[in-house]
A protein has these predicted regions:
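Extracytoplasmic beta-strand/coil segments of soluble accessory domains associated
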Residues: 35, 40, 47, 72, ...
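N-terminal periplasmic accessory domains that precede
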Residues: 71-74, 92-96, 107-112, 127-130, ...
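Surface-exposed extracellular loop regions of Gram-negative outer-membrane beta-barrel proteins
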Residues: 99, 252, 258-263, 360, ...
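Periplasmic-side early beta-strands and strand-to-turn transitions of outer-membrane beta-barrels
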Residues: 148, 161, 168-170, 178, ...
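Conserved C-terminal beta-signal and adjacent last beta-strands/turns
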Residues: 192, 234-235, 428, 541, ...
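Membrane-embedded beta-barrel scaffold of Gram-negative outer-membrane proteins
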Residues: 199, 294-310, 419, 427, ...
Length: 680
């Protein structure tokens, strides 16, 4: 169906005109820092002006000023990204929509190079167990656009690369406590020090606790998490270094239903705790063979586990007790990657490498009788950067991936960056990517009850395919202490995957299971930009805006089941809307950071988002949200620290996940807390 809505073409012109005519040039004696160097796109350290696609960099100051407690919230500041808070549903982070899965599988998430994608969570990311504390993040590089060339099929629409702080910068002791409404009770302890003469370490313990959204209707929401994280960096000699990461993150969420009252829960879905853990270890060896050449070998181990066990008592004679644990599963990943960066002299630079990954999953519920299911993936990749002229940078990338469940695929990318001068760059690029399904999609086989055959995987399920054209502009106006990043995109997704019930008649004894299959071709078009401006020394502004239009067409094969999900007009329309309205047609974010007298620091984050859908049968209505933070850093004898007061949703309650006008709606109410941090 072709949407009648089109994004306004005047947005960029308005932004540029306001810069050109509405501001006064800043004092040139005041230094405005250069645009950062990023390595998340091509795996080569590159200026933003040379990178083959758009990148948003979120630094430590932005993270702190945004007033977030949960990491997923910070991506509201990135053009094209959407998220919502932890509720009884898992939090998601998506780019350009298509977010119907519980654990978003189309944006790769990395922490110090380690993928957060899990075979347990549908080959997606579980934000409840993200193993990093906000205070330990140095910066986040967000690649806005497909990057399967560099990171594989999970980087289908983009990459979030989280880089943690060098332990050498965190020596000493740091303690923080937060206390506020909705039972916010957070504690953190960080210890950093030296490892003899060879390196430094950082050890962090963090605990978060809150009652989340106000209890409504038949559900109770609460969330708590614990994290232990260790990092050590050691210089083995002048050319070799070793980085060690290890730890565990745990998230506990309330799930289940009350059937409209707290005394009588649903026997088959009682109120209970869903416990999830992420245990990890990583070794990274780096070798500098010359000033222009280095190599890296990385091994990572990650184990994800979940559990929500309960008993069902059937009143027979004698009574029968059934032990149910739908989430009692385990997913384990071993990954080995080699990466080499080399200078080719006048020919350019190249980053190339190879990786091997072994995923296993065990689940008595969705993989009954199959024991431990294994999946192996091997990749080779390369990215070349050339500068044939001072006004031109070219990037060429190619990757091949062989998946034991999905087969072999290629991912190419080509871009050209035209530098009009040192301040203005135009970028044109094309890329192709493929996204594979999860172990569940290829191997699951289970009944949901004695009368319903719920799901049977298709071992020959095809992959999603993406062709992307983009036109970008990057302005680095140092005299004005401002930068502007613009991306126009045309993304065509072929064979979008979705779970379809081939017999939705709900007749007892139904033996035709659902499966994941291609249902649509999707086209995503739009424009997004981010403006960073420091009009005065104590003032920083970050403005982001996105206009997006999604069209979709059903495939004939998806409509071929006369009793299937898509044979019902309501489901046909709802799934079509779930695709086309899976991202807001217009979304805006603004972050204002202001230094005040007496060392006070003030910040305001504002978000304006149009109506969209996170689930098939509900809507997230249009909303505005404002978060504020006021902080006072201090020094007392040998102690330093900060007192901060934060308010989220200052303008009151609103909906971010779903809204249907009944008590089950998820309403985000005002939340406020006070934080004290002491550093020694």
């Amino acid at each position: 169906m072709k949407s009648a809505h089109r994004f306004p073409g005047i947005a960029l012109a308005t932004a540029v005109a306001s810069l050109g005519g509405g501001i006064a040039a800043a004092d040139e004696s005041i230094y405005f820092s250069e645009l950062p160097v990023v390595a998340s796109v091509s795996r080569l350290p590159q200026r933003l002006a040379d990178a083959p696609t758009a990148v948003t960099v979120i630094d430590r100051d932005m993270i702190k000023a945004s007033g977030v407690r949960d990491l997923n919230d910070v991506f509201r500041l990135v053009p094209g990204f959407q998220t919502y808070p932890h509720t009884t549903e898992p939090a998601r982070v998506s780019y350009h929509g298509l977010n119907d899965e519980d654990y978003s599988p189309r944006v790769q998430v990395l922490i110090d190079g380690r993928s957060m994608y899990s075979p347990l969570f549908g080959n997606g990311v579980n934000w409840a167990t993200i193993p990093v504390a906000l205070d330990d993040i140095e910066r986040i590089e967000v690649v806005r656009g497909t990057n399967s060339v560099s990171y594989g099929s999970n980087a289908f629409l983009g990459v979030i690369n989280i880089i943690t702080v060098d332990p050498a910068l965190t020596r000493g002791l740091s303690v923080s406590v937060s206390h506020g409404s909705q039972n916010v009770r957070d504690q953190a302890l960080r210890l950093g020090g030296q490892i003899g003469e060879v390196g430094d370490f950082r050890l962090t313990y963090r605990q978060l606790n809150d009652d989340a959204l106000a209890d409504r209707g038949d559900w109770i929401d609460n969330f708590r998490s614990r994290l232990v994280d260790f990092r050590a960096d050691m210089a083995l000699d002048e050319r070799n270094s070793l980085q060690i990461n290890a730890g565990q993150a745990e998230g506990v969420t309330g799930v289940g239903r009350l059937n409209g009252g707290r005394l009588f829960g649903q026997p088959t879905n009682p109120i209970r705790s869903l416990r999830q853990t992420n245990t990890y270890a990583q070794l990274t060896w780096r070798h500098a063979s010359s000033p222009n050449s280095d190599h890296q070998l990385r091994y990572a181990y990650v184990a994800d586990r979940s559990d929500d066990a309960f008993n069902i008592v059937v009143p027979l004679v004698p009574a029968q007790v059934f032990h149910i644990n739908q989430s009692g599963d385990e997913g384990i990943r071993h990954e080995l990657e080699f990466l080499s960066n080399q200078s080719l002299g006048a020919v350019g630079r190249i980053a190339w490498g190879a990786s091997w990954r072994n995923d296993t999953m065990r689940s008595a519920w969705v993989l009954p009788g199959q024991g431990t299911v294994q999946r192996e993936t091997g990749r080779i990749f390369g990215n070349w950067e050339g500068k044939p002229a001072s006004w031109l940078t070219t990037n060429l990338g190619l990757a091949g991936e062989n998946d034991s469940l999905a087969g072999f695929s290629w991912s190419p990318r080509l871009s050209a960056n035209f530098h009009a001068n040192a301040e203005n760059t135009i970028r044109v690029g094309y890329s192709r990517a493929q996204r594979t399904g999860s172990i569940h999609d290829y191997r699951a086989d289970y009944w949901s009850s004695l009368t319903k055959y719920q799901f049977r995987a298709d071992p020959n399920m095809p992959t999603e395919r993406l062709d992307t054209w983009e036109l970008g502009y990057l302005g680095d106006w140092r005299d004005w202490r401002a930068s502007l990043d613009v991306r126009l995109f045309d993304e065509k997704i072929h064979d979008r995957l979705y779970i379809i019930d081939r017999d939705a008649s709900n007749i007892p004894g139904n033996s035709i299971p659902s499966l994941t299959m291609p249902i649509q071709d999707v086209r995503i078009r739009g424009i997004e930009y981010q403006l960073k401006w420091q009009p005065f020394e104590p003032t920083r502004l970050v403005l982001g805006q996105t206009f997006t239009d999604i069209d979709s067409d059903y495939l004939a094969s998806a409509l071929s089941y006369p009793k299937g999900t898509l044979s019902r007009p309501s489901d046909y329309s709802n799934i079509e809307q779930l695709t086309e309205r899976s991202t807001p047609r217009r979304a805006t974010s603004l972050l204002w950071m202001q230094a005040l007298p007496y060392k006070l620091q003030f910040s305001l984050a504002g978000y304006w988002q149009d109506k969209m859908k996170w689930s098939k049968n509900t809507w997230s209505e249009k909303y505005r949200r404002f978060d504020v933070r006021l902080a006072y850093p201090f020094r007392w004898a040998t102690w330093g620290g900060e007192v901060a007061y934060t308010v989220q949703s200052l303008n009151g309650g609103h909906n971010e996940y779903k809204w249907s006008g009944d008590p089950n709606d998820r309403v985000v109410d005002r939340r406020q807390w006070l934080t004290l941090r002491l550093d020694y």
